[in-house]
Design a protein with these regions (language model features):
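Charged, amphipathic alpha-helical regulatory modules used
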Residues: 1-109, 710-715
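Amphipathic, well-packed alpha-helical segments that form the structural scaffold of globular domains
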Residues: 24, 47, 454, 458, ...
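Long insertion/accessory domains within large nucleic-acid-processing enzymes
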Residues: 679-716
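Short, solvent-exposed positions on alpha-helices
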Residues: 37, 57-60, 499, 523, ...
Length: 716
């Protein structure tokens, strides 16, 4: 009887069906090519060869036979997929795979990890510790948790399994903190009970403590859905407390009858000072805190209140102070005010603040000044957002991940206290390369990739569904997400659409160029791009019905992925003009960064894609220094309100510590950041703030993202 010698030297009976099954797996993989009957034909031929050989074959010899026969039968795609599968399996059998990666972090030679996140300073030991833990965690996940076909697809650049360095722990991606409940009903931090704050200053301090705790228990961004509205009652509390103190001073210190008019005037002035101090506390705390993730908390402050709100006056004061503090900036080590990366600010445009005759237009004017100087705030149009989200206006989680509308048992929409389980992204340009100009072939391959993405996303859900609340008390027991008991499972919060789980995508522009020969802004290109978006939406809708999970379509930020996908495809397919030669792929549905288009046409074009990318989207315009032309900024802001749900403006805000230059630091021919005055290229002596992909980065970027930033053209 024929026998096969396994890797450990043991022998098992020869089974040609196992050979055929392995070949079929490679054919049906993300990078293989199925040919009916081929697997069985090759298995039969190998069995015939082994019979003639009249001796046992090693597993290695069989694998070599499979590879060469696939080449012989003109199926190199499956041959490569088979080799990739073998490599992944070999990797999983290894016991120690992280030494080189960890040492590379310590000696700063592991560039791919060091530059992966532009808000993590890898020179700092606390950040290094997080990155080292990430490499070890990623290694365990690759060898023990992630199925081989998903891992092979990830390694080949067919898909990207985001945040692989966190999945061995029961953590989710991003959320909307239920801050209002935590401040109103109290919370617990590190086992210490925190009661309802009695003043605005204390509320601000508690808020930053909550933000830090939440950031350490998840790996993505967090947002406060209406920071002005939520903190406004505490301004009133401070005012009333201060007013009583002023009256007491009038009577007891100055021996006078209470003068209520004067007392109110003094109390309001002191309250404004407390609001200023409180907002300053939030801004400085967020930018100086270091979480267990090795970076400042990635937090978004969403500014939105309605004019008939009981505390509208106080909410407006908070919004005003947030904007004034951001315009001022924070000091760097050279004692110069610079643009802070966090918190991200979002300002909602609505009827009460968008026209010159509206009561809160002065806040919009202040927001325009802030944008011109500090890039934030970004803008959401209440009018356009309501069209896409069943009449609701709410914050994205982090920079762009949006929840789907969801109603509680009473039929009320709920957004605060909800979250996203994670992301898997598709490489749309790679499909275009493989399709070789055929639209039919493109969608055939896309459907196969979607099957893989579905499986990968379900893995994320399955890793969380049996988790108990004890893993992160701030989230699950003390109000950020829920108020469960110790030991209670979180599973019910994952299903029914309460939480979202995201199918990401990158490179609509490149995919369209490969299939239609034109940009996604062209007539044919736009039609094809929309077909892709429709197919992706069809998939998530099908999965939602099938699994009862809140799948969403998400325009991937792709901070490092833009470089990773492009580099993998260039290595595999060579240099392809306008595709792999750039060093990056274009984010999500965006217009190519090099394409000449004005801000109004760009927003108008991309607004149609936002309607289809409701699980995550944002559009931007590159503008010059407009601090002396605020009316033009206001004109563009008005256009956002009328035409697009969510948009932002990118300006330049840099500083050279060598010569004191304050202006735009550019990328030179060597892809290095260089001061135009003294030509300093030492990254340790440059502060460069750029929009990375929805938020600001300040610790530099990988090679691909740097090239993308360099290529950006102005839209005005």
């Amino acid at each position: 009887m024929l026998q096969v010698i396994k890797r450990d030297g043991t022998k098992v009976p020869f089974d040609k069906n196992k050979i055929a099954l392995a070949i079929e797996k490679a054919e049906h993989s993300s990078t293989g090519l199925y040919e009916e009957g081929l697997a069985q034909r090759i298995a039969d031929e190998i069995e015939e060869y082994a019979t003639k050989l009249q001796k046992d074959m090693t597993i290695y010899a069989i694998e070599d036979q499979v590879y060469y026969k696939l080449i012989e039968y003109h199926n190199p795609a499956t041959a490569r997929a088979y080799e990739g599968y073998k490599a992944v399996q070999a990797f999983k059998r290894r016991q120690n795979t992280t030494d080189d990666d960890v040492i590379g972090l310590l000696d700063r030679s592991n560039v791919s990890v060091l530059d992966e996140n532009s808000n993590k300073d890898a020179a700092i030991v606390s950040t290094q510790r997080d990155l080292i833990a990430g490499e070890v965690s990623k290694d365990i996940a690759r060898r023990k948790l992630i199925p081989t076909d998903i891992l092979e697809a990830h390694d080949s650049g067919a898909i990207h399994f985001h945040d692989m360095d966190y999945i061995i722990q029961p953590m989710f991606n991003c959320c909307l903190i239920n801050l209002e409940d935590m401040l109103t009903n109290g919370t617990v931090i590190n086992g210490k009970k925190i009661d309802t704050p009695k003043s605005f200053q204390v509320a601000c301090t508690v808020t930053t403590q909550i933000i830090a705790q939440v950031a350490s228990g998840q790996y993505g961004g967090q947002s406060i859905n209406g920071i002005d509205r939520i903190l406004a009652p505490f301004v009133r509390k401070s005012y009333e407390k201060i007013l009583n103190n002023v009256i007491e001073e009038q009577v007891e210190t100055y021996g006078m009858e209470p003068n209520m008019e004067k007392a109110r005037e003094i109390a309001w002035k002191r309250t404004r000072k407390e609001v200023k101090d409180g907002i300053q506390t939030i801004q400085y705390q967020i930018n100086t805190l270091m979480t267990t993730n090795g970076q400042s908390p990635f937090v978004t402050l969403f500014m939105y209140f309605k004019p008939d709100y009981e505390y509208a006056k106080e909410a407006a004061l908070i919004t005003e102070e947030i904007l004034r503090q951001r315009i001022k900036g924070v000091k760097n080590e050279a004692d110069v005010y610079i643009t802070p990366a966090f918190p991200k600010l979002i300002y909602v445009l609505d009827e009460h603040n968008v026209t010159p005759d509206s009561p809160y237009y002065y806040l919009t004017e202040l927001a325009a000044q802030c944008t011109a100087k500090r890039m934030y705030p970004d803008y959401i149009s209440a009018k356009k957002m309501k069209e896409n989200y069943e009449g609701n206006v709410f914050s994205p989680m982090g920079c762009r991940s949006f929840l789907s509308p969801w109603k509680d048992e009473k039929g009320n929409y709920k957004f605060d206290g909800r979250f996203n389980m994670g992301v898997v992204s598709l490489n749309l340009p790679q499909i275009g390369i493989l399709a070789r100009g055929s639209e039919e072939k493109y969608f055939e391959i896309l459907d196969k990739r979607l099957e893989l993405a579905e499986k990968a996303l379900l893995l994320r859900y399955n890793l969380l569904k049996d988790v108990v609340s004890d893993v992160s008390p701030i989230h699950w027991q003390h109000g950020a997400i829920a108020r469960l008991k110790k030991g209670e499972k979180i599973g019910r919060f994952l299903t029914g659409g309460y939480a979202t789980i995201s199918l990401g995508y990158i490179g609509i522009y490149e995919a369209t160029r490969l299939i239609t020969g034109e940009s996604n802004t062209g007539e044919k290109g736009r039609v094809f791009a929309m077909k892709i978006m429709d197919r992706l939406n069809d998939a998530i809708n099908l999965w939602h019905d099938k699994h009862n999970l809140g799948f969403g379509l998400y325009g991937t930020p792709a901070e490092s992925l833009t470089n990773r996908f492009s580099s993998l495809d260039r290595a595999r397919f060579g240099v392809i003009e306008d595709i792999t030669d750039k060093g990056y792929y274009t984010n999500s549905y965006h217009v190519n960064v090099r394409e000449e288009i004005n801000v109004f046409d760009k927003f108008n074009f991309e607004s149609e894609f936002q309607k289809k990318s409701t699980g995550g989207c944002i559009s931007y315009a590159e503008i010059p220094n407009m601090t002396n032309n605020i009316p033009a900024v206001l004109t563009m802001i008005q256009y956002i309100y009328d035409h697009i749900s969510y948009a932002e403006f990118n300006t330049k805000s840099d500083y050279c510590h060598e010569c004191g230059f304050d202006g735009e630091i550019k990328v030179n021919e060597n892809n290095e950041w260089e001061c135009p005055r003294c030509h300093n290229t030492n990254r340790d002596k440059l502060t460069v703030i750029r929009r990375t992909c929805g938020y600001l980065g300040e610790n530099f970027w990988n090679e691909g993202r740097t090239k993308e930033i360099k290529d950006r053209v102005m839209h005005i």
